[in-house]
């Protein structure tokens, strides 16, 4: 999942997760965590599959089948976060993770990470959830030529670079609009970018 897609997904999930109560944790398979939530008068299942290839994060009415004996990590999560309510999340979208404060004192955080999975922590590192620095968008062409573009500006994900390169050939006007809007309003920019780069659409 591209970081910009995660950014938009996290904004939508925040509306459901904020104020919800954690009912239960399950681990139906390695690297997969199911969080049963009570939100908006309904029980819902938040499913996270962590890993480098094909990570997932979604709400679903269906709950995957679970092993007869709960996994150790699921039991640990139940101990430290079961029964707690979730506050408004901080989103580190560049690294595809979000942290939700748990009710109780002192405040602890439930962290959902597409690479590492689900955990609970007492503190977050400084700058968690801070927006990345965007360079002058007029310099985009020269930035793409640099070998260290990923290290300097991780928000220029491979898929975003490929999409903008495609737009440079097919729709330069839209490409010029995408970058400024992406840095401010992802929900507006993403549909605009992907709808005009047809062959890139399935990968978004």
Where do the model's predicted regions map?
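Extended, highly charged segments
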Residues: 1-204
């Amino acid at each position: 999942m591209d970081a910009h897609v995660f950014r938009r997904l996290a904004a939508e999930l925040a509306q459901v997760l904020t104020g919800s109560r954690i009912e239960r944790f399950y681990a139906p398979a390695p690297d997969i965590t199911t969080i049963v939530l009570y939100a908006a008068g309904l029980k819902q299942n938040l499913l996270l599959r962590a890993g480098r290839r094909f990570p997932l994060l979604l709400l679903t009415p269906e709950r995957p089948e679970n092993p007869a004996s709960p996994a150790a990590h699921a039991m640990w999560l139940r101990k430290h976060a079961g029964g707690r309510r979730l506050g408004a999340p901080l989103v580190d979208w560049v690294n595809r993770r979000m942290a939700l404060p748990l009710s109780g004192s002192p405040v602890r955080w439930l962290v959902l990470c597409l690479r590492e999975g689900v955990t609970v922590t007492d503190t977050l590192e400084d700058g968690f959830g801070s927006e990345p620095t965007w360079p002058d968008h007029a310099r985009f062409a020269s930035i793409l030529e640099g070998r260290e573009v990923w290290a300097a500006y991780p928000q220029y994900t491979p898929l975003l670079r490929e999409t903008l390169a495609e737009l440079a050939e097919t729709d330069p006007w839209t490409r010029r609009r995408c970058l400024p809007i992406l840095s401010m309003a992802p929900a507006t920019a993403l549909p605009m970018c992907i709808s005009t780069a047809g062959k890139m659409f399935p990968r978004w």
